[in-house]
A protein has these predicted regions:
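Glycine-rich beta-strand-centered segment in the early N-terminal region that forms part
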Residues: 21-39, 50-91
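Glycine-rich phosphate-binding loop and adjacent beta-alpha segment
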Residues: 221-290, 324-328
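Mid-domain Rossmann-like dinucleotide-binding core that forms the NAD(H)/NADP(H) cofactor-binding site
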Residues: 80, 122-197
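A structural motif shared across PLP-dependent enzymes of the aminotransferase-like
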Residues: 93-107
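Short, glycine/polar-rich helix-capping loops at beta-to-alpha or helix-loop-helix junctions
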Residues: 98-99, 175-183, 246-251
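C-terminal capping/lid region of NAD(P)-dependent oxidoreductase domains
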Residues: 290-297, 305-328
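Short amphipathic alpha-helix with an adjacent loop that forms part of the alpha/beta core around
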Residues: 199-209
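N-terminal Rossmann-like NAD(P) cofactor-binding module of classical short-chain dehydrogenase/reductase
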Residues: 86, 212-215
Length: 328
């Protein structure tokens, strides 16, 4: 089978296609033909050794896939053969291997896909869907003004919708282009501003007063630009692992204004006993029309470098997906 491997850190060119034996499912395992594999920004950072944790090399990226069960090992019910499934491998301790034509996993780590949910949408609702779901429930947002950075991205586009459903008074979408602002509005954002406007925080103040909560999915210098938009007593939830850039003086200033700064990481919040129920909830919201999945581009396995370049240049919206068998 074909798979993507990283043997050295660097640009998208270090993503190489390698030939590997197709896995044989062991006892209790299934072999899944991968129809869609998710591409995430943290994988872009890992590839270039800019992530909070340096992965061991060689590595095969990919932590979320969807596909069809093609073979089963001993002890697995034969009824699983041919079923459409989602594999949130990251939630079950498997941190690599999804950028491939096939994966072998424990049968109890997958969940069935509704017939009306596409493979690509199922992938979009895994890492990014769960992140958005947990962020939307981290604090009560009822009657509050919430700013979401990168609001047209894979997490942001879902979070905007979930915050509105959770009765946020106003959801402000911070994006990088006019097209992305229009997308955020179509998803339910009440107000949009652009990173390109250096006075965006003042614009938010003038239109809506200050924000009670800011969910920062970007980090770096953008976190600093969020401070003037935050109300006294407000909170920034920092969900951009490895990209924290506030100085101690700026944090002291927040404390003086009774403002809070909270970190957010998805994996410590996930439990194998509940993650399937959470994903099934997201799948139901998507198939019932209450949650719109935004797809930002599909690429063959051979074009994985282009997928990483598109994400890195912030050209994309929503979820970027690989189609290892050209099913997209």
């Amino acid at each position: 089978m074909k798979a993507v491997q990283i043997s050295r850190f660097g640009g998208p060119e270090v993503l190489e296609i390698v030939g590997l034996p197709t896995p044989r499912p062991a006892r209790g395992q299934i072999l899944v033909r991968v129809h869609a594999a998710g591409v995430n920004y943290f994988e872009v950072l890992m590839r270039s050794d800019r992530y909070a944790i340096t992965p061991a090399l060689p590595m095969r990226p990919g932590v979320e896939v969807s596909g069809i069960v093609e073979a089963a090992g001993e002890g697995v019910a034969s009824g699983m053969l041919g079923t459409r499934v989602a594999l949130p491998t990251f939630a079950f301790g498997i941190s690599s291997g999804g950028y491939a034509e096939y994966v072998a996993v424990d049968a109890d780590s997958v969940l069935p896909l509704p017939d009306t949910l596409s493979f690509a949408d199922a992938v979009a609702l895994q890492v990014q869907g769960l992140t958005a779901l947990h962020l939307s429930r981290l604090r009560s947002v009822t009657d509050k003004t919430v700013v979401v950075t990168a609001a047209a991205g894979g997490v942001g586009s879902l979070l905007v919708q979930l915050l509105k459903a959770a009765q946020a008074r106003k959801v402000v979408a911070l994006t990088s282009s006019q097209a992305k602002q229009e997308l955020a509005l179509s998803l339910g954002a009440d107000y949009t501003v652009s990173y390109a406007d250096s006075n965006w925080a003042a614009t938010v103040h003038k239109a809506l007063r200050a924000a009670d909560l800011i969910v920062d999915l970007v980090g770096g210098a953008l976190t600093r630009s969020c401070l003037p938009a935050l109300a006294p007593g407000g909170e920034i939830v920092f969900a951009a692992l490895g990209r924290f850039d506030l100085s101690s003086e700026e944090v002291d200033g927040m404390l003086a204004n009774n403002q809070a700064l909270s970190g957010f990481a998805l994996l410590p919040r996930l439990a194998p006993s509940t993650v399937k129920a959470e994903l099934l909830e997201l799948f139901h919201q998507a198939t019932s029309g209450r949650l719109k999945v935004v797809l930002g581009g599909g690429f063959s396995l051979e074009r994985v470098g282009e997928a990483h370049r598109a994400i890195e240049s912030r050209e994309t919206v929503g979820k970027v997906v690989l189609y290892p068998h050209g099913d997209g």
